Amino acid sequence: MQEVARLHRKVRNQRQNAHHQLSRRLVNQFDLIAIEDLKIKNMVRSPKPRPDPSNPEVFLPNGAAAKAGLNRSISDAGWAILLSMIGYKAESAGRTVVTVDPRHTSQRCVVCSHVARSNRAKQAVFKCQRCGHEDHADLSAACNILWTGRAQLARASVG
């Protein structure tokens, strides 16, 4: 039992150390840090059962096993702790942290602003259906998050 507790403590310390290093690097490197306002509770929700239309007593596969692994990964990441560290370090360093509505950040083209679910036909590739712009999906989403964060900050400073 003590061995298990020791291993859990070791993992917790490693995660906390990684969070401290990443948050320090971000705060030292950037004046503005824009973060998606993700609802983690919604992200780790279990998939709904899918009843078989031809036999109501039987349920069809709903991807619950794969979703359970993703849920565990999301929960283990400790995002709330990382965001908290970024927040207090940014405040003490005079940096700005902006939370951004996550809607359409991965579907909006950074070139022409066209929003379509079909812009993300593949998980890792973004390809705009209007202008043809192609990019890594995560990079495109990060640019949209930053752009939205800058726009929010500009609106807040004006009015």
PLM feature spans:
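Positively charged, helix-rich recognition surfaces that bind polyanionic ligands
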Residues: 1-159
